[in-house]
């Protein structure tokens, strides 16, 4: 009897006044707990393969696998889906299929955004945005207003509005309003478009005002935005300066050139430029073609040789900056081949590779094609990074007052550190003379990477900063260091051109950790040490041959030691 007294009863007595009249706090707690459990159970329908009792499929363009859904859940939560499924109620098809593009009258909703939307539909809970599709691959970005974050919120807004979920519309409208003032004006355009299509008046007015007071040129606005919005922006711009809009001849001529580009008529472009006093640069024709034309048309425009590939438009963007925004390798490569400078910065301190990173989602960066090749977005970043590494001496207009050291500035500095370290390894006397002349020692406290020759973990050292040092001082110090190293490398190119070419050949492998670091030859297994020595000796032989070639070429110098000969040449340049 005593044993049964301590066991929980299998039935609940309702005679107790405490149980029959529970307090409001207890009732609320149990209700919340029950709702939480219900929400979790419904989520299993989406995430657990064992609970796959779906009865319809949504096919999203370019996605191999459709998204399976339960019509009863969607119909209960959304009037749009209720009306949609009513039409097919008598259909003989067991699992009807719906194309996302047919459901949306405007805009786009990708797979990840739709799954995020469905998660709310099933559970009633709005989760944080998934990092792999709502952030960028720029390591110094806060991801509070970068393009992937905006695009994901815009897609969710289209889904929420079209599929008639008012509470989500309100939530995402607040989020998008926060983005408008934080983001670059070109990133505001997709927000403006979703506000226009979804009748979000407050958000639309905010976007129009932001674009109107920006320096975004009229031809870009005409290309991107609906006529109704365009007229409002024009009116606001006229009011802000109190000057009536005048259609001057240069704008008219520019418009004709750009319309010819819109029709892919490069011959007409050439004719218009020949017959008028406007140039392709003045019309920003190459910028426009790179932004909007087919890559083949861009190549044809480049072949006219009528434009400066490093010309800046009124906003400070070079053609390569615009190409980085488009992220099309078949446009970026011809521009670089024509001499576009990958190291040029915008007025606010962004380079082409930095722009490209801020537009690229981690998912797109890491995804490979069916043939196991990198995605075209990663390819664009790789091309631009390699170009910066290949031409580190072309510094562009490097900013000196950035709030954080730009990632491509770190990359160039790392490249130069490793290159000078490699030169020290093979001809220390000559390298030390060149470094003395460039006053590298005076900047060595920046990183301390040159002795011993840098290994491949130097990025960690580059990241170590003095917490008491302001961002301005830190960036300025790094630039001083970089300029000294650039001068050292330039000296090597001038006096040892063959050695310079050999180092060029091996630097990409060195940066990718394919060349052994001989600072620690004892590291690794016996086989690894043997391979390391063989690889090192192969490189050493190539450098020796190149050095002998340079020595013969400079036989006119003094027959004294190589270091003194170089020093004399540096101190008394002819």
UniProtKB/Swiss-Prot annotation:
Residues holding Zn(2+): 136, 141, 143, 146
Pathway entry: Protein modification; protein ubiquitination
Gene transcribed to yield this protein: NPR4
Comp. bias (Basic and acidic residues): 535-553
Subcellular locations according to the entry: Nucleus
Summary of the knockout phenotype: Enhanced susceptibility to the virulent bacterial pathogen Pseudomonas syringe and to the fungal pathogen Erysiphe cichoracearum (powdery mildew). The double mutant npr3 npr4 accumulates NPR1 proteins (while NPR1 transcripts level is normal) due to reduced NPR1 degradation by the proteasome; this leads to a reduced growth of the compatible pathogenic bacteria Pseudomonas syringae pv. maculicola ES4326 after inoculation, but impaired hypersensitive response (HR) and subsequent systemic acquired resistance (SAR) induction when infected by the avirulent strain Psm ES4326/avrRpt2.
Ranges where the BTB domain occurs: 54-130
The name this protein goes by in its record: Regulatory protein NPR4
Top-rank lineage group of the source organism: Eukaryota
Region (Disordered): 1-21, 521-574
Record GO terms (molecular function): identical protein binding; protein homodimerization activity; salicylic acid binding; zinc ion binding
Similarity comment: family membership: Belongs to the plant 'ANKYRIN-BTB/POZ' family. 'NPR1-like' subfamily.
PROSITE patterns in the record: ANK_REP_REGION, ANK_REPEAT, BTB, ZF_C2HC_NPR
InterPro entries in the record: Ankyrin_rpt, Ankyrin_rpt-contain_sf, BTB/POZ_dom, NPR, NPR1/NIM1-like_C, NPR_central_dom, SKP1/BTB/POZ_sf
C2HC NPR-type Zn finger ranges: 133-147
Region called Salicylic acid-binding core (SBC), residue ranges: 373-516
Name of one Pfam family that matches: BTB
Species this protein is from: Arabidopsis thaliana (Mouse-ear cress)
Membrane-traversing stretches: none
Induction data: Up-regulated following pathogen challenge or salicylic acid (SA) treatment, and down-regulated by methyl jasmonic acid (MeJA) treatment.
